[in-house]
Amino acid sequence: MRWCRSPRWGRVSVAATAAVLCAGATAAAGATAAGGATGARAGEQPDAGSIAVNCISAAHPGLASRIAQGIHAALSGRSSTVALRVYDKSEDLNCYLNTRMRFDSASVVKVIILGTLLRETETQHRHLTASEAYLARLMITQSDNNAASALWAHVGRGRLEYFLGRAAMSETQLGPGGYWGLTQITAHDELLLMQLLQYPNTVLGNASRSYALNLMAQVIPSQRWGVPAGAPADLTVHVKNGWLPLATHGWRIHSIGCFTGHHRGYSIIVLTEDNPTMAYGVTTIQQAAEVIHSQLNPAGTVFLPPSAPAPSWGQPDEQIPPSLGGR
């Protein structure tokens, strides 16, 4: 993997020769985020150049070791700069890689916009209007930019900031003006967001969580690449992706998702940049995702194949002006 940006100290090496650290006996996965989402910070270690992938499971240390080694192998030799977060409550498993590194969000920020909208309807004790529901569906299932821009303006920065605060997503910084795709995100905060949707909490009620997950389960086929690669066919896939080229660090290619069913659920977050093409970044994510799914599920599981390139690949999901780093 490429030399990676530390959020504070410039670049530190997480090259393919870096050590894989797997600690089995430290830190349980029961820590809670604000509002009751479980496990997002459990056992988290600070990113360091000597650690490629850190997986922890007090209950299943062998599993943690296999997943860490598999992710390490999947990312070795890739030019992509990668941040990754995995959480499986049932397996008491957490994995970390560059979790505090900031990336331009591209379209994954649309889940934050949706969460803010749903939180606002709860505060106002009302349902979504027909217009809000229409725009929310377009924004999530088709990654429609006009819908995202309309809802970004509709909820406003104040409510977006309030939602981030309630969700304890303190590392997320909203993009300037109407450029939601330049919001700064981290794998740490994106995992918190996925857990807000999966587990009961005081930020979003059950109906809102179900609504958001249902939309993420209906993303159109051409946008179901990334972390769904290799997922069990009998689990429900909830996904949102982002893809954006900028003048520096190439394509930002991100995939966030959770996988639910049969009384279990787990989340995978992969954020990347320094990708020469969109397809290259998608491949980086899918190689890691296939390893994770295969290790978290029993032998004999029928897995979904990785996505093949679609005609729409290579089209930026937001137009950024050169003055803000666009190309």
Language model segments and positions:
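Short helix- or helix-capping micro-motifs
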Residues: 137-139, 167
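Active-site SXXK
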Residues: 92, 102-126, 139, 268
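Secretory targeting and sorting signals
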Residues: 1-42
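N-terminal post-signal-peptidase region of extra-cytosolic proteins
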Residues: 98-102, 254
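Acidic/histidine-rich, surface-exposed loop or edge segments in extracytoplasmic proteins
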Residues: 43-56, 93-98, 114-117, 141-144
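Flexible glycine/proline-enriched surface loops and loop-helix/loop-strand junctions
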Residues: 96-98, 132-133, 142-147, 173-178, ...
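Penicillin-recognizing serine hydrolase domain
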Residues: 43-84, 89-91, 151-327
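Short, well-structured active-site flanking segments
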Residues: 119-137, 160, 205-208
